[in-house]
């Protein structure tokens, strides 16, 4: 499994993927953040937060949304008055959060497809980029359909991730560095360790790993020459 460098909630917040008047949604993504991320939001400037998140890509790939995101951040810092008359700002928003995550979420290597890229090719490419293992060392298990993780995000929209089951030799060597900009840590874990490390509210992800575990215990894996 891999651990993201930044929590999903933090990335959504810095990118300004919300309406400042949708308090409940903003509260939901704040509750997904780590304690360190919450502290940084209160103590650092938006420019510092933006540069830290995107690194060398800060002025290129997401330039179009930077100013919009900054305006929302400053609006909340100065205070927002809801239509109900209730007011809040960044400080009250963070202080009302009841979560205390120490690390960002753990999950599986995945990502978006490139233009005209097939699902399977995307899966192999993302695995190589995010783990450092050569994708050619992977052996796909062909007679198992992809596992689909369908879930409702904090924005109440439906999303679907598709995972392909593959395996590699025990003595496979990780030759390349994984994407440090997106991946903070990586571990080979047992089924129990996976279940323990996945956040409790990520029920769909827990269901995926349980289904994989059941498949591996109920069926024999055979090499086909």
Set out the residue ranges of the language-model regions.
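Internal, charge-rich low-complexity segments
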Residues: 1-80
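Unchanged
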Residues: 8-9, 53-56, 61-216, 220-225
